[in-house]
Amino acid sequence: SSDLSVQIEAALSPLPGLVREVLAEVKCLGVGDNKNVVAELNVEETSHQEIQVVGNGEWCITMGGRDCSLQMHEQKLLEVSVIDEELVEQLDRLSPEDPRYSGLDTALNTLRKMEAEASRFGAAVGLDSVSTFECIVSDDEHYFMEMNTRIQVEHRVTELCYKLRFTNPEQADDYFEVDSLVELMVLIARHKKA
């Protein structure tokens, strides 16, 4: 091949032979001393979605997702809330024979998988603030990209859909609600266990 930098193959079955071919080609024709080869999964027709995660070091929860696929020059132009309740409501209005049903059902199951993964990840690292768990999504598959352990400017999209109620376990009518992620960060920082 004349282009040693990028080779995209559509099928996985001939992969071992293709890897040997690329390694031999790099060994013979590669420039310089660096003969490293990187193999990446080529994912097409994707969306960029992030899950809002909140934890205090002991517990970790998620607050839905945001689809931030519409971007230009690596800047997000539009963020759309992707929440379980909305997807369930849309599915309830459709019959399973409706052509949109399958796509919504896939989106709901993928969101639930991402939220469960994000919550496990946050709990595993002892997350003690707010973060976003970012993924590339293609149909019913999602691929973890990164965890941003800071507030993001688009956090207001989540705040429009969620608020948290903190209740005294000994007195159900003793509670307060938080609808600001920044306020929640301050509360967690002030009251987390040492």
PLM feature spans:
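ATP-dependent carboxylate activation and anion-phosphoryl transfer catalytic cores
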Residues: 2-194
